[in-house]
């Protein structure tokens, strides 16, 4: 699939959908904020360069008591040292990216690129280097020393050494799998709470839409990153239309596949061209999943870590158990959220837009399915999956959630029955019984075990 390809029947003169500069894109860009910091440092240097007081000014002796030659030597030394430090920083960053991709999940690479500390260190080092060479260019043996520039380089040089030491400690901490799991969990939890409204019943909404309708094919291929509802609402109200979007953030679409279904208020024909143009503006399609509106991405990252941990090349079931523990916390939070489709009405109260949404079964399947299949012969991980289901069972708020939890539990027990020796199978079945106790509301019996890696009494 080629990202950004268009349908054969499209007019080549029609403008492509605009490129959106979003906060997430800027945050995930490893070069943008360091470049801004470097540019600001150069501008500040140029503004300070004309300040060249003579030796009679006492404060200049406090900032820089020596002459032009010594100042030039300082700037040369700082520039050389900072480039060495920048090389070390880039090397450590590349090692971190390689380790995250090979040992944990390729979907974690974006988290390293959007790390604020890494961008700050690169910005300080790059800014210090540019200030040094800019100041060196402005040195003149026939003129007084630009003391403010030299003082700035002196301060930035000290700051560069400090941030390099802090960065090494930060990288060492970031490469720990527990830190990666914590960051993925916290980011997913923040997106989850921004995306889904609280619902004490956890019931999904149903919306009565007329039969039929006009399918709207997509004009671009890629992955849905965000959905901007406002331009769609404006177009739908103006033209008297009702739309149901068939895709959602995280979905992969191809040219010609249906992305929406549209009805006219009066039952007449739908202006397909105008609808497609508005959809192209509203659907941000890229080449990778982003966390802005994609709650499932964080769960996918944690599931990837669990699956990778139980692979033959790593063979670390304890890490897999811990990853399922983080997933359990997210799944418990999802139980009291309004999942599924959402409806949006115009100022007159007329239903105009219905968006698609994932249900609780989707999230449970996404977490439990891959881990259960890859851990079919590892009792530690299968017990952790059942422990996750027990936590979800203890907080389930409706019968549909209980049914899904019971279905997942039975699949784990069926897997264990065909793969485990008797002693391991009995341990897993004991946890399966505790899932049933939690579903029945007997929490004392459900949580009185001593087994597992993350809970004991």
Language model regions located:
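Membrane-anchoring hydrophobic segments
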Residues: 1-76
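Short basic (Lys/Arg) and small-residue
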Residues: 2-20, 144, 148-150, 166-244, ...
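Membrane-interface segments at loop-to-transmembrane junctions
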Residues: 19-35, 63-80, 105-123, 144-153, ...
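Short secondary-structure boundary segments
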Residues: 28-39, 109, 126-130, 134-138, ...
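A residue-level detector for conformationally permissive "hinge/kink" positions
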Residues: 33, 73-79, 83, 214, ...
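Transmembrane alpha-helix detector for multi-pass membrane proteins
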Residues: 37-56, 66-140, 161, 165-168, ...
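Short gly/ser-rich anion-binding loops that grip negatively charged ligand groups
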Residues: 95, 99, 154, 292, ...
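Generic detector of multi-pass transmembrane helix bundles and their immediately adjacent loops
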Residues: 152-164
